């Protein structure tokens, strides 16, 4: 029995036979509900062609939550930092508000800790939901053309407070 009162709630890596169900949920949420047409597996084939990149939470035999992990190496000579980007966090619409995305993310965090990754980036529009799991906002801004306007105040330092944590990783791993 899970603390949510649901029998047989399990998180783990997506199985190959579950991939169509997961893709249907992700595409429904992030593509079709927004009036888009190019499905995620065509936009992100490297991440979504391997079920090993997808973490799911199952209730009995049904997928109720999922997220995608894209592992990468961040080269900061002389270092090669092992890292991951996490995105496409999804919970079935009828199951929202029960902590299932948190359950899925907690399992993903355990997996990444076992892999001894140096850091991970969580892409979310709701950072407050995940702060209790140890995630901190480290948004460095947007790199894109945009409408310009005069600054309302003098320029300030570009790095947020959390960037010091990233520098600590670099110092710890430097030879």
Region spans (language model):
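Short, positively charged and aromatic/hydrophobic N-terminal segments
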Residues: 2-3
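Extreme N-terminal starter segment of soluble prokaryotic enzymes
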Residues: 7-9
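A conserved beta-strand-loop-helix scaffold within acyl/acetyltransferase catalytic domains
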Residues: 11-89, 173-175
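Short coil/turn motifs at secondary-structure junctions
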Residues: 72-74, 94, 127
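Conserved acetyl-CoA-binding loop-helix of GNAT-fold acetyltransferases
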Residues: 88-91, 97-112
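Conserved active-site alpha-helix within GNAT-family acetyltransferase domains
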Residues: 114-119, 124-144
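Amide-forming acyltransferase catalytic core, primarily the GNAT-like/NAT-type
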Residues: 136-175
